């Protein structure tokens, strides 16, 4: 679900299709019909994440479980991150467009150590506090 504010900023970034979802084999479920919503995050760009076989296997497997909807989120490129921060748009899942902070679980697939800082950046962009007391 792309709202008007997001639609405006997509006109100002490179490769806007990486932020819209809607691709072939995307799994959409009825929010009211699921018990658990899981945000599967990959701390790199869409192109890198979608070429990761492990992520694709987990996405498919989790969505086969009854009552579970697994959605995807990727680290935005610098131009998109800048626009999202400027317009106060939190990091969102591709399938529903919902902010990551609205999910029951948020998980990350880490392929290498250099991605650790992107995890922190994605949590910050999603307005998810790093400490439970916040």
Language model: regions and residue ranges:
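A short, structured N-terminal alpha-helical element that caps or precedes a catalytic domain
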Residues: 1-134
